[in-house]
Design a protein with these regions (language model features):
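Bacterial N-terminal signal peptides that target proteins for export
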Residues: 1-9
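C-terminal motif of bacterial Sec signal peptides marking the signal peptidase cleavage site
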Residues: 16-19
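Bacterial signal peptide processing site
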Residues: 21-23
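Histidine-rich, glycine-flanked metal-binding segment
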Residues: 33-34, 48, 52-95
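Histidine-centered divalent metal-coordination motifs
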Residues: 45, 92, 98-106, 229, ...
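Divalent-metal coordination cores built from histidine and acidic residues
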Residues: 89, 93-101, 111-226, 259-300
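His/Asp/Glu-enriched, well-ordered alpha-helical/loop segment
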Residues: 221, 313-348
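Glycine-enriched alpha-helix->loop->beta-strand junction motifs that scaffold or abut catalytic
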Residues: 240-247, 266-271, 328-330
Length: 348
């Protein structure tokens, strides 16, 4: 068993790189080849969050063989393979990679690649872009980014016309146009179809029940789930009755009533991606020090202030989320933006 701490590993890597530049002697060239190194790496001493419903494991041992996790258990309950590289990380926490189900990535491939790499730094293993991605961009989903998160996409999405915006989602003004948009999105194999239903604070017309009913029905016929951007409770009720699969936001205009909870529970496969807004209370961002540029952190801190109006908005959504979660509704994480560390604030 080879035991290393992180500092020692860095030193050895540095020495190894230095040695690579030295010319081998005839004696070294004649030496027998060394035995193959073990492919097993062990991280021990950290708290492990298994992600399968079990409680966190204190003083855990995580055993990885190549690119496969073979064991996650408490110290003393599992045997460390002979020849394994052991890395001691007491005081750390290891958890499964995060799947951020609601992001808005850059508009071009180079930007998306950068976005995915930045997310991996913060433990995000997959990110789903929720609308406005071009057909050309979503065609690159299978092009994995080394060291980056996986990329999923809703494509362009569907909305009523938005004045002043020349491009973006499929603009629809009829049931027929909604159906055509779904057929196109399904043809490019989007991961989910997004529809913006609400009026965006009175700036656009709503997608009508007839429109979103046809969108949901057509998408289901084509084997694609539908996710809706909503604001108020009445729209949520209509979408639940129409068979919606996923909410891209929680209900934000009021505390939900018993009928809404009953409609959620009558749809056992419904998913709520809550996307809680800023809480309106200052947040500890010290974990970003040394990870993001100082000016980026300073800008984030400048906006990190107490705000009573934001607290009220947050309170409505937090209460609704808590009620539906306690009732048994499936909740997923989403952050609705392009901030790579945002999932950690959302989890908190």
């Amino acid at each position: 068993m080879r035991r290393m701490n992180i500092a020692a590993m860095a030193a050895i890597i540095g020495l190894g790189l230095s040695a690579c530049g030295q010319q081998q002697t005839a004696e070294q060239e004649a030496a027998p080849a060394p035995a193959p190194a073990s492919t097993v790496t062990v991280f021990q001493g950290a708290t492990l969050i298994p992600g399968d419903g079990r409680a966190p494991i204190e003083n855990g041992v995580l055993i990885i063989d190549g690119d496969t996790i073979v064991s996650a258990a408490a110290a003393g309950t599992v045997e460390i393979p002979e020849g394994a590289t052991v890395i001691d990380i007491p005081g750390r926490t290891i958890m499964p990679a995060i799947y951020d189900t609601h992001v808005h990535l850059s508009a071009d491939r180079a930007g998306v690649v950068n976005d995915l790499i930045r997310r991996a730094v913060f433990g995000v293993g997959a990110a789903q872009s929720m609308g406005r991605d071009s057909d050309e961009l979503i065609a690159t989903r299978s092009d994995l980014v080394p060291g980056g998160a996986r990329y999923f996409s809703a494509g362009r999405g569907i909305s009523r016309s938005e004045p002043g915006r020349p491009e973006g989602p499929f603009w629809i003004e009829s049931v027929e146009e909604g159906v055509e948009a779904v057929q196109h999105l399904a043809s490019v194999d989007v991961d989910v179809i997004k529809v913006w239903v609400d009026d965006r604070n009175g700036t656009v017309e709503k997608v009508t029940p007839e429109m979103y009913g046809a969108i949901i029905e057509t998408a289901h016929e084509l084997g694609v789930r539908v996710e809706a951007h909503i604001f108020n409770e009445e729209d949520a009720k209509g979408l639940l009755r129409a068979g919606l699969d996923i909410f891209a936001h929680g209900i934000r205009d009021k505390d939900i009533d018993d009928e809404t909870e009953a409609l959620f529970l009558a749809n056992p496969n419904i998913i709520l991606s809550a996307n809680l807004p800023d809480s309106g209370y200052p947040t500890d961002l010290s974990f970003l020090e040394g990870i993001v540029p100082a000016d980026t952190l300073a800008a984030a801190q400048a906006e990190n202030v107490e705000d009573a109006d934001t607290q009220e908005t947050f309170g409505i959504q937090a209460r609704n989320l808590d009620r539906l979660h306690n009732a048994g509704v499936t909740v997923t994480l989403g952050t609705d933006g392009n901030t790579p560390w945002a999932p950690h604030l959302e989890l908190e």
